[in-house]
Every structure is written in structure tokens, then in C-alpha cells.
Amino acid sequence: QMVKAATFMNGKQMGETLELQLTWNKATAKPLLGNRKNEMLLVNGLRGSLKYTDFEWCNWNRNDSISFTIDLLGKEKLNKFAIGCITNYGMGAHKPKMIRVEVSDDNKTYRAVGELNFSLEEIYKEGTFRNDYSMDMGGVSARYVRVTAKGAGICPDSHVRPGQEARVYFDEVIIE
């Protein structure tokens, strides 16, 4: 769905029309039970661009253990999970080592849905690109979806930023 906005003064458009492509899924606009101010970006329906500075990316560094929970506000049948991630090799932005998804009916007892693990070669691939990492949820029913990820670690000696801690950027959670 496309949303268009413009600023007008005295009936005359000032500047260009802003166009935002919104995506809607079961996670969109749902509450996040996490501890970061910008986690709301993960469910706002807007995808990040190839510029990790476009204010649509939620980021972590210092090898953080990343964890957030989406409250779907009721039990839903869940078929697919995806999360957007950016790589910007020159800036030390890389996918995490691991992404795990778990579900719960009560936000206390969680059951595993799936886990993605990435090799060092995959993590430190050169270039600037965006990927969606997805997993089949098998039609499980649940109210809460917990996402846990582990940071990529320290950039290797062969990296343009050797010894620097890699950063992880996610833009949108998509649940179908």
C-alpha cells in the first residue's frame, strides 16, 4: 500500500511528494516487549533502504544478544517468519551469527519454531545489500513471537575494519 504526503502553503505544494510503501502483515503495528526505544521500527510497516541511516533500521552493537517479543494480541496461525537485515561491509554492518524464533501462548513458556545460523564467510561477505531471512513456522498457533539473535562478533583481520565490533541492523519483521 502506497502512502503519499506533501506540504502545502497557501494552496501551493512546497517541495516533493513523499511516497512511502507500507507492508502489512500479522506483526505490523503490534506491541513489542523489548528494551530498546527504536524497536518499534521492526513492526511499523516500512522497509529500510540500502542506507542504514534512513531511520528505518533498528541496530545493535557490542556483540549484543538481541531479543524482542511481538505480542500479536491474540492467538494467530503462523506460517512464515521473515526479518530484513542489511549488510554494509565498509561500515562493519553485518548479519548476526544466529537468529532464533520461538512462540508462546502465555509469554512464559516458549517453544522453538526454528533457527538460522550463518558461517563467518556468510556474515562477512563484501558488499552493500539487504536480505530477508525467513523460516517456515509450520502453521503453529501462538500469541507471542520471540526473536533472539546473536551479534556477528569482531570483524576479522582481513576486514576493512579489523578488530571493530560488527553491528546488526534489522528493519522489519514479517509474519504471515
Predicted regions and their residues:
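Short intrinsically disordered coil segments
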Residues: 35-39, 115-117, 162-164
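Aromatic, loop-rich ligand-recognition surfaces of beta-strand-rich domains
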Residues: 50-114, 129-176
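Solvent-exposed serine/threonine-rich low-complexity stretches and specific carbohydrate-binding patches
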Residues: 112-123
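Short glycine-/Asp-/Thr-/Trp-enriched loop segments that recur within the blades
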Residues: 124-128
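Short, compositionally stereotyped local motifs that mark structural "simplifiers"
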Residues: 1-67, 86
